């Protein structure tokens, strides 16, 4: 393979990464979120969502309604939680939400921060679920939970780039 072919492959790879990054940033701006896509990591929302489903989020709604499926983050915890709004209270300044997983027996009070009885929509909510793709996100779960799968996948990608003819 000559230098021109190698440069062409490198530029094509750069184009793919730049396009993916621009698509991600466009989705972020349109949805008003830093992360407009999340993967379901547990079975707490079954049967609505299964582990490995990809969820598309939106954060341009003024208020949440009872029954909306929301994604929220708790201070001190790194993993976002996907649950349904069970109860809501609001006044002119803020909206407070109580959530619960469809497959859970009790509400999420035990998941919230200490001395927190409700989620504050402005501070805790990441977004509202507007759509999903079933099971496509399962690859990310396999990569994060299985070290051998991660290294095997990286090895295959490396080998394919070494032996490609284009």
UniProtKB/Swiss-Prot annotation:
Residue intervals on the Cytoplasmic side: 1-9
Membrane topology type: Single-pass type II membrane protein
Gene Ontology terms: cellular component: signal peptidase complex
Pfam family, one: Peptidase_S24
Lumenal-side segments: 31-166
GO terms classed as biological process: signal peptide processing
Keywords recorded for this protein, A-Z: Endoplasmic reticulum, Hydrolase, Membrane, Protease, Signal-anchor, Transmembrane, Transmembrane helix
InterPro entries on file: LexA/Signal_pep-like_sf (IPR036286), Pept_S26A_signal_pept_1_Ser-AS (IPR019756), Peptidase_S24_S26A/B/C (IPR015927), Peptidase_S26 (IPR019533), Peptidase_S26B (IPR001733)
GO molecular function: serine-type endopeptidase activity
Catalysed reaction, written as an equation: Cleavage of hydrophobic, N-terminal signal or leader sequences from secreted and periplasmic proteins
Stretch list, region C-terminal short (CTS) helix: 152-163
Protein location: Endoplasmic reticulum membrane
Domain of life from the UniProt record: Eukaryota
UniProt-annotated catalytic positions: 44, 83, 108
Ranges that cross the membrane: 10-30
PROSITE patterns tied to this protein: SPASE_I_1 (PS00501), SPASE_I_3 (PS00761)
The protein's Enzyme Commission number: 3.4.21.89
Homology family: Belongs to the peptidase S26B family.
PANTHER family: SIGNAL PEPTIDASE COMPLEX CATALYTIC SUBUNIT SEC11
Subunit structure: Component of the signal peptidase complex (SPC) composed of a catalytic subunit SEC11 and three accessory subunits SPC1, SPC2 and SPC3. The complex induces a local thinning of the ER membrane which is used to measure the length of the signal peptide (SP) h-region of protein substrates. This ensures the selectivity of the complex towards h-regions shorter than 18-20 amino acids. SPC associates with the translocon complex.
Function statement: Catalytic component of the signal peptidase complex (SPC) which catalyzes the cleavage of N-terminal signal sequences from nascent proteins as they are translocated into the lumen of the endoplasmic reticulum. Specifically cleaves N-terminal signal peptides that contain a hydrophobic alpha-helix (h-region) shorter than 18-20 amino acids.
Domain comment as written in the entry: The C-terminal short (CTS) helix is essential for catalytic activity. It may be accommodated as a transmembrane helix in the thinned membrane environment of the complex, similarly to the signal peptide in the complex substrates.
Name used for this protein in its record: Signal peptidase complex catalytic subunit SEC11
């Amino acid at each position: 393979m000559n230098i021109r072919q190698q440069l062409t492959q490198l530029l094509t790879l750069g184009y793919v990464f730049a396009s993916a990054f621009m698509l991600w940033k466009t989705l972020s701006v349109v949805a008003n979120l830093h992360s407009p896509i999340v993967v379901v990591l547990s079975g707490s929302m079954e049967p609505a969502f299964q582990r490995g489903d990809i969820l598309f989020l939106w954060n341009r709604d003024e208020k949440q309604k009872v029954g909306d499926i929301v994604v929220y983050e708790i201070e001190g915890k790194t993993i976002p939680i996907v649950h349904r709004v069970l109860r809501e209270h609001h006044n002119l300044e803020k909206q407070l939400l109580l959530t619960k997983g469809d497959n859970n027996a009790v509400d999420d009070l035990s998941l919230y921060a200490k001395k927190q009885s409700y989620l504050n929509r402005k501070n805790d909510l990441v977004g509202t679920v507007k759509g999903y793709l079933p099971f496509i996100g399962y690859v990310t779960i396999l990569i994060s939970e299985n070290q051998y799968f991660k290294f095997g996948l990286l090895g295959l990608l490396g080998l394919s780039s070494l032996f490609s003819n284009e």
